[in-house]
Amino acid sequence: MTHHKTLRLILGDQLNPSHSWYKQKDDDTLYLIAELKQETDYVKHHIQKLCAFFNAMENFATALNTAGFNVLHLTLDDTDDDKDLIELLKRIADKYQCETIEYQYPDEFRLKSQLAKFKSDSSLNVIATDTEHFLLPFTDIKTRFTKNKHVTMEHFYRAMRKQFNILIDDAKPTG
């Protein structure tokens, strides 16, 4: 059994080959891409959507493997005994003697809460990082919105357009 210091979780909607995680290979890092029953049952999904989602995960795992990264891709059959994501993370971290678990901030509140609780309860070093697939980093969102204040998204979108020069011509909106 190979020992890995770091376990990096890749969720199914985080298949971004441009993420900074993949700029450098590290033999001490194991990337985990796992199909989980909990992700099929929390809301009704069309079977073709699930198949496409899992196929994309498998293809991403294969691409990372081909690029020389250590990747563990687990199918639904492989994770059948894991009741949820946290149980899976504990099992894999224990199996590979990982000291650190890293994950990218989930887009869904449900998973964000699950992983935040795991982070606070775990004896392992658990680190959350940005997904890098949005214009605005996750940690900057709090600076854009005042707590307990009504927010109009129109103003937020205008500020984003100006900051990133999207649909702006001569400092004026084009669309």
Predicted features by range, described:
Residues 84-175:
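Beta-rich, aromatic/charged-enriched effector core domains that present basic-aromatic interfaces
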Residues 76-77, 106:
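Short strand-loop junctions, especially beta-strand C-caps/beta-turns
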Residues 16, 39, 79, 109, ...:
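Surface-exposed, flexible loop/turn segments at secondary-structure boundaries
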Residues 55-58, 83-87:
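Short, contiguous clusters of charged residues that form electrostatic/catalytic patches at enzyme active sites
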